[in-house]
Design a protein with these regions (language model features):
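N-proximal low-complexity "stem/linker" segments adjacent to membrane-targeting elements
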Residues: 1-27, 34
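Short catalytic-loop micro-motif centered on adjacent basic/acidic residues
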Residues: 7-9, 102-106
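Short acidic, S/G/P-rich loop/turn micro-motifs used as interaction or catalytic elements
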Residues: 14-15, 40, 108-110
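Short alpha-helix within the catalytic core of nucleotide-sugar-dependent glycosyltransferases
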Residues: 19-23, 98, 111
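Short, well-ordered alpha-helix to beta-strand connector turns
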Residues: 29, 96-99, 106
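Acidic beta-strand-to-loop metal/phosphate-binding motif
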Residues: 33-35, 103
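Active-site-proximal specificity loops/subdomain of glycosyltransferases
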Residues: 37-100
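Acidic donor-binding/catalytic loop of UDP-sugar-dependent glycosyltransferases
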Residues: 90, 104-111
Length: 111
């Protein structure tokens, strides 16, 4: 059987969407790698805040099979937002242990 990984990004809209998004694909994948900027800064360099305690609790409740890994890294190294986007997605992809890697934004739902 082919094993599947998912990467997703934790940012300003994570409390609204991320857990719901993950719930839609959780049972179909073997690994979920989430990236969050260590300084809580967007790719454009703007600070953001989320309710981390609530989010981590929500993700913990979903993650009965221990599939979720959270990576904290400096994902705003460039002054060009799209370069930071590419860097983060490629970095997270490199952390995956499976050959099939899917990328879902927090506000994207698998139907």
């Amino acid at each position: 059987m082919i094993k599947k990984s998912v990467i997703s990004l934790v940012s300003y809209d994570a409390n609204r969407f991320l857990a719901k998004s993950i719930e839609r694909y959780y049972e179909y994948v073997d690994e979920i790698v989430l990236g969050i900027d260590k300084d809580r800064v967007t790719w454009s360099g703007n600070p953001f805040e989320i309710d981390e305690e609530a989010l981590w609790n929500e993700l913990s409740n979903i993650d009965g099979d221990s599939k979720i890994t959270i990576i904290e890294e400096d994902f705003h190294q460039s002054k060009v937002a799209i370069e930071n986007d590419n860097y983060e997605r490629n970095f997270l992809k490199g952390e995956c242990s499976n050959d099939w890697v899917f990328s879902f934004d927090a506000d994207e739902m698998l139907v």
